[in-house]
């Protein structure tokens, strides 16, 4: 019986792991599980799609589902959260938030590529409408929807790292007024020395 390889996380690392697993094992069942409803896409391109430099958010998607399912024989399970792993029985617990459905999936090999999460702050008002984190395509769509609803378009960005600075540029291209706040004295504090950061600023 072919072994089952389960990959948790459908970003670049997870997709790469699934495709390499296919190259090394032509007979295994490979299941790639992602919590978003889309296959792998370029997260770093999100601000550029938002600004219009890249034609659309969909242009960031690397491969369509047939490339996974038919070309590489990788089964996609999109829109599922991994809520538990039992290493003793080699089983993962999955939940689909949109309808609450739960499943268990046995594995012979498990690869974890869950990636990062957007940094958030637990400040009063951080849960109000109009407050966003930027990490996913859905985040960008919600921000675009919000900006289309309001007449005066002003955005405050907390953080002047790479994502915050790219979003500031994207918003300015879209004629949105931007205020960017950063705890460090200069922008891109973990990437550039102060002299270079001052030039970029």
Feature roles, as predicted:
Residues 137-139, 161-163, 185-186:
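Short acidic/polar capping segments at secondary-structure boundaries
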Residues 40, 120-121, 165-166:
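Glycine/Thr-rich phosphate-binding loops of Rossmann-like dinucleotide-binding domains
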Residues 157-158, 181:
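Hydrophobic residues in beta-strands of the RecA-like P-loop NTPase core, especially within AAA+ ATPase
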Residues 60-61, 103, 163, 196:
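Residue-level preference for nonpolar/small residues embedded in alpha-helices
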Residues 9-13, 135-136, 159-161:
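Glycine-rich Rossmann-fold phosphate-binding loop(s) that bind the pyrophosphate
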Residues 1-8, 61-62, 66-154:
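FAD-binding core/adjacent interface of flavoenzyme oxidoreductases
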Residues 2-75, 168-195:
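Beta1-alpha1 glycine-rich phosphate/pyrophosphate-binding loop at the start
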């Amino acid at each position: 019986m072919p072994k089952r390889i389960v990959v948790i996380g459908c970003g670049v690392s997870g997709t790469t792991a699934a495709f390499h697993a296919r190259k090394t094992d032509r007979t295994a069942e490979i299941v790639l599980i992602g919590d978003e409803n889309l296959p792998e896409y370029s997260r770093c391109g999100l601000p550029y799609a938002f600004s219009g430099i890249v034609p659309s958010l969909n242009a960031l998607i690397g491969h369509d589902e047939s490339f996974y399912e038919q070309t590489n024989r990788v089964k996609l399970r999109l829109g599922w959260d991994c809520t538990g792993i039992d290493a003793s029985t080699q089983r993962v617990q999955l939940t689909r938030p949109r309808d609450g459905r739960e499943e268990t999936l046995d594995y012979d090999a498990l690869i974890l590529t869950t990636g990062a999460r957007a940094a958030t702050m637990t400040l009063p008002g951080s849960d109000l409408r109009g407050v966003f984190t930027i990490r996913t395509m859905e985040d960008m769509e919600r921000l675009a929807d919000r900006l289309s609803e309001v007449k005066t378009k002003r955005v405050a960005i907390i953080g002047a790292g790479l994502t915050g600075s790219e979003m500031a540029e994207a918003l300015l291209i879209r004629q949105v007024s931007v205020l960017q706040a950063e705890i460090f004295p200069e922008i891109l504090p973990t990437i550039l020395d102060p002299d270079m950061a001052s030039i970029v600023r």
